[in-house]
């Protein structure tokens, strides 16, 4: 891989991890709010406890099994590592050492949802000043909106 290809991949991985981190954090926050909302409903005796109770249990199980908060934190750490590599890539003496750093970071990558791949590509190409070629599907547009992909990302090399 050339240095430009590695640079593109690093920025793409940063974008993907950042989108995944943001989306999973927002999902975790929505589920937490739903837990509090349903819990208040049970406490002040609004609605049927036989409906609110299983709702609380279901959301708690969902949060525990899918671990959105943990996934968000791990993806955030990984996105910071990708951004650091992108901003310090000029310090690597050769393409080979940069590629080795790239592959070592790649081993810890999150298993991001496939609906975020398209928005990550668009973010990467936009950050590099290119015009995205393929349009996003409706689902990808929704995921991009929910994960904050509509905001511009930094692409400077300090």
Predicted features and spans:
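Cytosol-facing regions at membranes
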Residues: 1-29, 44, 69-158
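Alpha-helical transmembrane segments and their immediate juxtamembrane boundary regions
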Residues: 19-73
């Amino acid at each position: 891989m050339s240095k430009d290809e590695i640079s593109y991949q690093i920025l793409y991985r940063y974008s993907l991890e950042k989108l995944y981190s943001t989306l999973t954090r927002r999902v975790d926050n929505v589920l937490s709010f739903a837990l509090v909302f349903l819990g208040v409903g049970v406490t002040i005796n609004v609605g049927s406890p036989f409906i609110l109770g299983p709702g609380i249990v279901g959301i708690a199980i969902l949060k525990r099994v899918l671990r959105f908060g943990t996934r968000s934190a791990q993806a955030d750490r990984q996105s910071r590592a990708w951004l650091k590599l992108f901003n310090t890539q000029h310090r690597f003496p050769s393409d080979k050492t940069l590629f080795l750093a790239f592959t070592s970071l790649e081993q810890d990558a999150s298993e991001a949802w496939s609906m975020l791949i398209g928005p990550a590509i668009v973010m990467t190409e936009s950050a590099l000043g290119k015009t995205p070629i393929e349009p996003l599907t409706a689902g990808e547009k929704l995921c991009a909106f929910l994960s904050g992909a509509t905001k511009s990302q930094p692409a400077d090399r300090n």
